[in-house]
Amino acid sequence: MRGAFDLANKKILQDKNSYGKPRPWRQKKLENLRYAEYLSILLYKKAHKVQGCADVLRFRKLPDGSTKLYQTWFCKSRLCPLCNWRRSLKNSSQLTEILAEAHRRHSTARFIFLTLTEENSVDGVDLKRRLKALTHAFFKLVHYKKVSKNLLGFVRSTEITTNANGSYHQHLHVLLFVKSAYFKGTGNYLSQVDWTNLWQKALKSSYKPIVNVEAVRTNKSKGKSSLLASAQETAKYQVKSADY
């Protein structure tokens, strides 16, 4: 009875973000356990270590009476959903600071969100080669004079999706930071057609690749009243961890 009484009076602790919303530890832990199960089936030795990832969360009581997560242990496996989620939070925080500093130095500059794709779908054996070619094409693109003359910096991430037939499709998501002059005059502004032609040239492809480009604007629906806040929201997508 004492055990039942103690359990009934236990306080459930929650780790919340700065907006007061609970962080999805349970969801990520379930994904982690599923990943550990796959490793176990394949007889990987690290399955046990992955299974124990973030099993214990230690909270610290703050002076105001609230509690805050201050310690846990991660398996640090590259494909662990829990570790990737925490890594994405860290990367997002660091990226937000970088964007804020960039905006402070160039207050009139603008952010552009660019998606670059290619038609080819590849198997696992050829994926590494195609990713290398895609990266090479991207650096050719940003060094073209039409792009580089107004480009102040960029953040790039690679997304790989799986097709129904088991092949892979790779594409790039890029957050560009450009001078305000980019939006002034035909000699500076690049339309979607311009970006498509430049990307086709960089890829050395015989087909027109799919390219999407849009200026980052104020997101009033989410209460983002400044251009920088909207860019920060976009940047979070840049470092979003994959689903497993």
Question: What residues fall within each predicted segment?
Answer:
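N-terminal alpha-helical interaction blocks
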Residues: 1-70
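Residues immediately within or flanking Cys/His clusters that coordinate Zn2+
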Residues: 77
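Short, ordered beta-strand-loop transition motifs
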Residues: 62-63, 106, 163-165
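Conserved His + Asp/Glu catalytic blocks
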Residues: 119-140, 145-244
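Short microdomains enriched in Cys/His and/or Lys/Arg
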Residues: 88-124
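Intrinsic-disorder-associated interaction segments
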Residues: 28, 32, 43-46, 88, ...
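Short, cysteine/histidine-rich loop/knuckle motifs that typically chelate Zn2+
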Residues: 81-85
